[in-house]
Amino acid sequence: MRTSVFVALVVATFVATCISFTSAKNVAQIRDVDGGNNVQETRTLAEADDWWLASTNTEERSGGAGFFSKLRGKVHAKQSSGVMTTQKLNDQQVKTITKEVATTVKKDRRTWPMIKKGLKILYGALLAGLIIVGVEAMLS
């Protein structure tokens, strides 16, 4: 990308954000309007003992569990049951796999670019997953 295009993009972004700041200064201030949002009003919540007797109008419910919290719960359940444990490869197994890959690449050199592309896609997907998990952990 040329530097002039980049500078034009930065200037356009700056101008767009400044317009919203200037329009926010000119907004009329509305006072003494009662919207019925009194802070001192109390909301009725269901008691801990009779939560099943309360109607849905008086009961405060949280939204459903998010995707990541459900996923985190499933992973935790599998880890606690011991299903997630994997065996580590020893040196002999690693050498065997390396030899098999090397013979495949020697037989047909056209397969190496496909293997390389697959590894790049795998790396990108894992990196994106780690970023998403990191952001989710920081937000919660």
Curated annotation (Swiss-Prot):
Belongs to the RxLR effector family. GO terms for cellular component: extracellular region; host cell; membrane. It is a single-pass membrane protein. This is RxLR effector protein CRE9. It is found in: Secreted; Host cell; Membrane. The chain crosses the membrane at residues 119-139. The keyword Transmembrane applies. Effector that is involved in host plant infection. Contributes to virulence during the early infection stage, by inhibiting plant defense responses induced by both PAMP-triggered immunity (PTI) and effector-triggered immunity (ETI). The gene is CRE9. It comes from the Eukaryota. Induction: Expression is induced during host plant infection.
